Amino acid sequence: MCGIVGYIGYREAWPIVLKGLKRLEYRGYDSAGIALLNESGQNIYKKAGKVAVLEEFAESADRSGTIGMGHTRWATHGVPSDRNSHPHTSNNSKLSIIHNGIIENYATLKEELLGRGHEFKSDTDTEVLIHLIEEIQKIEQIDLLEAVRLALQEVNGAYAIVIMDNDHPDRLIAARKGSPMVIGVGKGEYFIASDATPIIEYTKNVIYLKDGEIALVTKDDLLVKQLDNVVQTPLIQELELKLEMLEKGGFDHFMLKEIYEQPRSIKDCMRGRIYPNEGKVQLGGIKEFAEKLKNIDRIIIVACGTSWHAGLVGEYLIEEYARIPVEVEYASEFRYRNPIITEKDVVIAISQSGETADTMAAIEMAKERGATIFGICNVAGASIPRLSHAGVYTHAGPEIGVASTKAFTAQVTVLTLMAFYMAQQKGTITTSKMIELLTELEEIPEKIQQALGSNDIIKEVAEKIKDSTNCLFLGRGSGFPVALEGALKLKEISYIHAEGYPAAEMKHGPIALIDEEMPVVFIATQNSSYEKVISNIQEVKARKGKVIAIVTEGDTEVKKMADYCIEIPDANEAFLPLLATIPLQLLSYHIAVMRGCNVDQPRNLAKSVTVE
């Protein structure tokens, strides 16, 4: 959600922090701000709107200083405005703070501080935190690091914070709980950020702060403590991220680039994990649990958004091939009820970023109740892999567009591999069948490349329906989660109201909406429910609905009925979700572009939802 950048060293901080905020724009935000320290004191610049607005606002201002921090805000407490933008200052204006997260007990703390004479300039929970830190430092007569440590013990909620002190212009203080934070290690300089994207062009050596850790950062040194005051020895890791991965590479938008990267990202996801000639899948991340997989009672998949749709595909695959019962849960709902969980359950947590707050809370609860946790994640070093007993990385590479594309197909690929691996362990699949499936799975990247070849046709279809106000997506079997994902993509980036349904459920309500103005997108590939989908198409046509069908290459039956057909290569039913998703991504993209929408940064959306 919010983006954080900090710098301390020998270079000018402004260009580093500003570029870092631009790198973090993909996370979603509504305002931006930067604070700098130099010989004359602290300078804070903040504006509602894009980073470019902030840059223009501060163009003629004093932007000197080798210590600075910046923030992109996604409003939670207080409307988007200049005064609610970060950084915020203490009552005496000597301390400043940037913050990602939510302080849940801020209202109670604010009342106490108001009673002690504090005056607030914003409506945010963040300003309350920096006032609390100042108050504790004043009353206890302690240094700032200790005041921060004590203050954080009084707050409930999640946070990643960076604090600057006018009286000590040679240091930054950073801390985190429930929100991500990474520290880049340079020579005579340190970088702080929400993720590694602002850091990669300066250093590949990073430290991922753990929950409940506080860091005192100077240009030459780093001290890390836990909230209980125990000093830690941080682990320095090397980033695999490359700078060119963060550029558009000639595409108009990151989303389009990432759609076209899917043949490669899926190949990367499978590399070293499938052996078609032997009919074997190897998943090193979960191999130590191979024996346990033979005796588990149930799998529970927890996720949010697009990852939840991937989980639904996983449910079909795991039950079909491994014959293990699967439940797919919204993490945000699962964590707030009292689910029955035993030590014979495996919980699979899916998150692109590995920092999704509700998913983290769900697996922490399941872990406490004895379940084994497997994580599926795209970001090495993120929180969910660290919280999990084992897991599998998707290796999709950085995904900058807010609307997920290649991360979704990589998650589905990993779930496919997990389904086959579990089937292999349980003996529910023959070697000959596995050879057949893996041989075809190896061909999927090339088939996705073929599906991308329909881009011009998809663009023509987009032109025909771009002015619609509603759209329905229908599918059966594993085509249902594809329909859900197609609807989500369209509403996310084009702002057209869209819903996904099982095709058979159409007559239980949605059919009332169908008329000549309603586009209905069918996942109508030649699978086990093909004939039933044809009947559903006929029902829509009888009510004059406009039918757009995703069909298997060479299909003639659906073409007789549909207004528009988009072909994908033929494939085993297990792999159709990977192929059928591609034209829906392109359709949503082109409609959004034609409507003049901000494709990479849709309104009100955040790439990584790190608050509940």
List the model feature ranges, each with a label.
Residues 4, 36, 97, 163, ...:
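Structural beta-sheet core signal
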Residues 291-436, 440-443, 525-564, 568, ...:
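Glycine-rich phosphate-binding loops that contact phosphosugars or nucleotide phosphates
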Residues 229, 546, 559-561, 571-612:
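Generic C-terminus detector
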Residues 49, 66, 70-83, 277-290, ...:
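Glycine-rich oxoanion-binding loops at beta->alpha junctions
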Residues 262-266, 270-300, 390-519, 592-612:
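Active-site phosphate/pyrophosphate-binding segments
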Residues 1-252, 264-297, 336, 431, ...:
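Conserved short alpha-helical segments that host acidic/polar catalytic motifs at enzyme active sites
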